[in-house]
Design a protein with these regions (language model features):
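Alpha-crystallin/small heat shock protein
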Residues: 1-117
């Protein structure tokens, strides 16, 4: 709740003319095994190549853009519940060092595999 309030505060007091901020944050799951950490990001319809993932200190930062497929951009929209546009998610990671970051898409989720060093 506090993080959400801080995010709203930053957006409200952003300087005029500043670059637009990401518009939404996808939900994530973080799982750990003996040799890796898996971060599952719910991004149906987004290809792994259309995302960026990087470790920043003790966090994984995942960003990208979700857009309607080209063939559907002129369709009549009756309901649009899946978020569109720029997204960014900053995920706290379990303590440790990671030697590799790999991305793949499985069943509508971006799967980020972090190999432990």
């Amino acid at each position: 709740m506090l993080a959400r309030a801080e995010k709203l505060h930053r957006e409200f007091f952003r300087p005029v003319g500043a670059a637009p901020q990401p518009t939404w944050e996808p939900p994530v799951d973080v799982l750990e095994t003996d040799d890796k950490v898996l971060v599952l990001v719910a991004l149906p319809g987004v290809a792994a190549d259309d995302t960026d993932a990087a470790i920043d200190g003790a966090h994984l930062v995942v960003g990208g853009t979700r857009v309607l497929p080209g063939a559907l951009r002129h369709a009549t929209i009756h309901r649009l519940e899946l978020p569109q546009g720029r997204f960014l998610r900053r995920v706290p990671l379990p303590p440790g060092r990671y030697s590799d970051v790999r991305r793949s898409v499985v069943d509508g989720c971006l799967v980020i595999t972090l190999t432990k060093a």
